[in-house]
A protein has these predicted regions:
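Membrane-proximal intracellular helices of multi-pass ion channels
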Residues: 1-335
Length: 335
């Protein structure tokens, strides 16, 4: 039991959302607060959190620390990294606060004063792409957000929090600096936004056509988009994923491998990696000498790095699945 709990806490910190006990019914209020703190730390990153303490205490941040912060948030340069870190911290807490306030009417209606804690917890969990929920009871464990499958407010707020947290801090910076003038965005931000939109829209359309046939039109649209948004990085669900068809599950596996974007609260192979590989494939088929997008050419090193990351991810994915299948004596498709 102790080992199970420690594994669960590890998943909290690593933003995976996997649990061995129901978070809502198993843990006390203090335990849930610790989990929330770990989710927030994992979402922002240890380096960002440590740097924030240094800034609050008035300590000078060394060049080496600035370089580490640059790597942690995938910033293009060391210059302005402290300003960017402050922007990330302020933006994070503001967005999480807005998300919590928007969900208050629904959760307070259903849970009374406890709804305040529910709103805060799920706002942070969604923004940090953790996928943890505290809606479980001793009678119904691991419900996730299935009770709110037809609630537009909860669906839309959670989806927006997941997407905003998953597109990366530099993309926020571009939006706040350049507003809707997309031409002035960094190349990375442009790729992230286009890839994210495609990776949300295409699976949602597939789910809409292949699953949820018994739902009303509005409920079906919400369920399709919610599952598409959450499966890549977060881990919430409003529908019974086990009841979805095998083709949908295969798409889910691929989307989970891709994950979120660089410098974000999400994990995975990253949207930019898959985008570079697809663009390089099109360039190869078109017999183009170099990979180009938005008028910019990729260095061959970028393409090689993307291919290396993808190969490593797929190797670890299959190796992990085979290992679990052999150890637990279950079908490989269930791993």
């Amino acid at each position: 039991r102790d080992r199970s709990v420690s594994r669960g806490l590890g998943d909290v910190y690593k933003r995976q959302g996997l649990v061995v006990v129901d978070t809502g019914s198993y843990w006390s209020a203090f335990g849930q607060a610790v989990i929330l703190l770990l989710i927030q730390t994992g979402g922002l990153g240890v380096i960002t959190v440590v740097a924030s303490f240094s800034m609050v205490s008035g300590r000078k941040i060394s060049l080496m620390q600035r370089s580490t912060m640059q790597d942690a948030i995938s910033a293009p340069k060391v210059g302005g990294i402290v300003r960017l870190t402050k922007f990330i911290l302020q933006g994070t807490f503001l967005i999480e606060l807005i998300g919590a306030i928007l969900m208050l009417p629904v959760f307070c209606r259903d849970y009374g004063w406890k709804g305040i804690w529910m709103s805060v917890f799920h706002s942070v969990s969604a923004f940090c792409n953790a996928g943890f929920d505290i809606l479980g009871t001793t009678e119904q464990t691991f419900p996730s957000l299935t009770g709110y499958i037809a609630n537009p407010l909860i669906n839309l707020v959670i989806m927006l929090l997941i997407v905003i947290g998953g597109i990366g801090f530099l993309t926020w910076d571009d939006f706040c600096t350049n507003k809707w003038n997309l031409k002035r965005y960094r190349l990375q931000s442009k790729i992230i936004l286009v890839t994210t939109a495609v990776l949300i829209l295409l699976p949602a359309i597939f789910f809409f056509l292949s699953d949820f046939a018994g739902f009303s039109m509005g409920k079906r649209i919400l369920a399709s988009f919610f599952q598409s948004v959450t499966l890549r990085t977060a881990g919430f669900n409003t529908a019974d994923l086990g009841a979805m068809n095998d083709s949908s599950k295969a798409i889910m596996i691929l989307m989970m491998l891709i994950g979120g974007s660089p410098g974000s609260t999400a994990g995975g192979m990253k949207t930019t990696t898959i985008a570079v590989l697809i663009l390089n494939a099109f360039a190869t088929f078109g017999r183009e000498p170099e990979t180009e997008v938005f008028g910019r050419r990729f260095d061959n090193t970028v393409v090689k790095n993307a291919a290396t990351i993808a190969i490593l991810y797929f190797f670890l994915f299959f190796a992990g699945g085979i290992a679990i299948s052999q150890i637990e004596h279950v079908a490989l498709s269930d791993c």
